[in-house]
Amino acid sequence: VPNWTGRLPLQGRPLLLLLSVWLAGRAAVAFSADIGWVAAAMVDCAFLALVCAAVGREIIAGKNTRNLKILIFVGLLLLANVVFHVEAHFAGSATYGRRFGVAATLALVMLIGGRVIPGFTQSFLQRRGAGRLPITFNRFDGFCIAGSATALAGWVLAPDHKIVGLLLIAAGLLNFFRLARWAGERTSGEALVLILHLAYLFVPLGFVLSGLVAWTDIPLSAGLHAWAVGAIGVMTLAVMTRASLGHTGQALHAGKGVQAIYAAVLLAAAARIFAALAPQWSFVLLHVAAFAWALAFLGFLAAFGGALLRPRRS
C-alpha cells in the first residue's frame, strides 16, 4: 500500500492494534466453546474489517483511488470468514467457507502478483542488459483475472461440476500464458526474483488439477493444496523475505539461508500435492510436507527475527 500511495507504512500504535486484534482472533477461535461462536466470529472478523478500513484510508489519503478495487478482494475474504463461522456452527463443517476463503486469497495473489512479479522482474533484468522483458499489467491481465474469478466462483459452489471443470482448466491455461509473459526464464540468477515466478506457477497448476476433478479420479485436495500451500504459502514467504531484506537495510539478494527457506517451502508444496495424488505414499509425504513447511517458516524466523527487532541498518 505505501508503494501505491507514497505514504509511510502503518507503524506504531495502529500497527500494534492490528497485531493485537489478529492475536485476539486466534484466541477467540481457540476458546469459542467457552465464549460462544458469535463472540468468537466477531473478534476473529474484526482483523480483516480493520485491514479494510486501514487500506481504504491510506489509498484515499494518498489520492490513489484506482487501487480501491483491492478492497473488493479483502472484503470478499472478510465475507468468507463470516461464512466460515456461520457454516461451521449450523452445518458442523465449513466446506464452502474454506473454499471461499482460498478463492478470495488466491484472487489477491493473482491481482497483486500480476503487478509486483513483472515489476520486480523488470527491475532485475534491466540491470542485466539486453533481453526480453516482462509485459506489464494490461487488458489481458484483467481478462485473465475476471475469467479466473468466474471459475473460482463455480469451484466454491460446485467443484465437481463438469462445466466448472472446463472453466477451471481454461483459467489454468490463461494463467500459464500470463506467467510466460513475465520472462521468468531469465531470473535463474537471482532466487529472490525466481521464487516469485515459481510461486505463481502453482496458480495455473491448481486450476488445472481442480478442473480435472470433474473428469478424472484426481481428488479435490490436489488442486486445493496447489493453491493453499503452493501459490499462497510460497508467495507469502517470497514476499516476506524480500520485504524483510528491504526493511532491515540488507541487499536485495537471496543468500544461502534464504535459498534454503525457499527450497523447504517448495518441497512442502510438492509433497502435499503428491500426497493427494498418490494416496499409497500419503503417510510419508504428509510428514515430509509438514516438516518442510515448519522448517521453512522457522527458518524465516531464525534468519530475520533478530534483524526485524533491531533498528534498521543505515
Regions picked out by a protein language model, each given a short descriptive name:
Residues V1-S314:
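Hydrophobic alpha-helical transmembrane segments of multi-pass integral membrane proteins
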